[in-house]
């Protein structure tokens, strides 16, 4: 895929192993973990923008919530949003790399299926607003087999919430009502 991307105009690439053929006038950066490096680069890029950023997570309703928030914000602000439901370690950086100087707000959807993933995406996103739609059974088998495990994983969204940030929780969700905010 590297040579295809480079031949279509990419200036360079991050790679865990050097390709057999190096194309002229392209750059190659060797990294141990390409996914980690992509996320670190996206986080660095996001920090160049002093705009409100909403990070949305939850067991269900993430995409609908993201679309509604972006539609409302878009009435008054030039708002970037996650495309479709590209809410993983590849899609989140791709969204952040679409930030431009004219953007005034962003709504970033983040999904997960293991502990640590929402915190990692929050490290990239650096949210000023954190939204948890609900806590359900999605991926429960990877999260201690309990909804409390799912709650703990979703609560990772607060790890990188701005100190003066806002948490928005679904008041109808019984587990979200057990959280004591500010969350530490």
What kind of feature is each model-predicted range?
Residues 1-40:
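N-terminal leader/targeting and accessory segments in enzymes
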Residues 36-171, 175-183:
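Phosphate-binding loop of NTP-binding sites
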